Amino acid sequence: MIIYNTLTGIKEPFVPFSIDNVRVYVCGPTVYDFAHIGNARSVVIYDVLFRLLKLLYPKVTYVRNITDIDDKIINVAQNTNQSIYDVTAIYIKAFHEDMRMLNCLEPTYEPRATDNIDVIISLIQKLVDSGHAYVYNGSVFFNIESYSSYGQLSGRNISQLIYGSRIDIEVGKKHPGDFVLWKPATEIDNQLMSCWSSPWGLGRPGWHIECSAMSYRYLKENFDIHGGGADLQFPHHENEIAQSCCAFPDSRYAKYWVHNGFLTVNDEKMSKSLGNVLTVRQLLNSGITGELIRYVLLSTHYRKPLDWNSQMVASAQESLNRMYTALSSTNVDLSLDDSVELSSHVIDCLKDDINTPKAISMLHEMVTEINKTADMIEKISLTKTLIKTANFLGILQHSWQDWFKIDDNNQEISQLIDERKKARANNDFKRADDIRQLLLNRGIVLSDNKDGTTHWYKK
């Protein structure tokens, strides 16, 4: 397996610290609202990576955190007269429901920041004691000038970090690039109980230290892969490296850094001001299936930008319909036995830097072979491999009947299809076309197979 490492800027052979337990950490959601489609892209991409690693190695420990203490969470709690725990409980539950609809596996561990305050405080104290952090009026800041390799992930150097350059400016900082590890409690924090006792007084952790603490608790000083969106590369991931490597000088923290690309909607960045934030829940409620969402997210290479638009969704729908139509030609049972093997060609695509679009194109080549062959034994064998391999990618989870919402008791549609078949046999193509259009006007799409049969599905 080879993977692109943001830290080195090249694709590298994947060599884990231990083949007996591959360890992965991915930045998860901040739970103040429903997950949007950009959040979902990250979850789906690292779900495929998790599946692949589980195939290749005997044990994989996958940690995806939940940020359940944050300024945005506090704002929602304050505006809705709820506790932060009530707010986060709502959106954690929703996140889990939505990701299940996208057929994502659960991570091995899903720690919450508020359950790890003791680890966070211990790590901050370690940085203070070693001179890499300093205290000012109840705040604790990390001193970036104490870490000579700061900027290695993002390609920045300390001299570039001037006031106003994507960094928070706060009173008490020694350098404008220094970042907060611990914030003193405000009056609102006290009211909402969003603060904890510490050696520096009541307060709450900064965002960056949370991930360092949780990755350390579950994966220790060194682990194999750290994933997240490209927007997290700086400052979040850069700061994680700095504080973790300073807390544990003999460690390198994560060996491989993997970042998925940005997602836009109709060529525009998602933002509440534009009113174009698409949540997974909105899409599901609009009738777009979780499998279709997943297919769209996998149809572009994870490192490339992805633009969500109606044309892409329609194209993905047609592609999935084509796959399910191929299943209908053999009617193979979805519950396959272990003797059915995955397509080695598809797995090879995934082993080449998680190349999901190429893997999907290989699935469509299999569909073409299924449609071409007249040998039913070969057709069934190919169909079984298609189902097993597509399932590995998290798609083709339904029977073709369920996918096309077929109702076997709808005699009228069956009679019209039979009438159309007779019309075609008698070269009455106008009548055949009229019947097709009549059904189309009612939302029924016909799909003619090479063996002379016709299936239908609802738009």
Swiss-Prot record:
Group of enzyme by EC: ligase
Residues annotated for Zn(2+) binding in this entry: C27, C211, H236, E240
Keywords: Aminoacyl-tRNA synthetase, ATP-binding, Cytoplasm, Ligase, Metal-binding, Nucleotide-binding, Protein biosynthesis, Zinc
SUPFAM superfamilies: Anticodon-binding domain of a subclass of class I aminoacyl-tRNA synthetases, Nucleotidylyl transferase
Any one GO molecular-function label of the UniProt entry: zinc ion binding
InterPro entries tied to this protein: Cys-tRNA-ligase, Cys-tRNA-synt_Ia_DALR, Cys-tRNA/MSH_ligase, CysS_C, Rossmann-like_a/b/a_fold, tRNA-synt_1_cat_dom, tRNAsynth_Ia_anticodon-bd
Motif range ('KMSKS' region): 269-273
GO terms classed as biological process: cysteinyl-tRNA aminoacylation
Keyword 4Fe-4S: no
Co-factor note (free text): Binds 1 zinc ion per subunit.
Main subcellular localisation: cytoplasm
Name this polypeptide is given: Cysteine--tRNA ligase
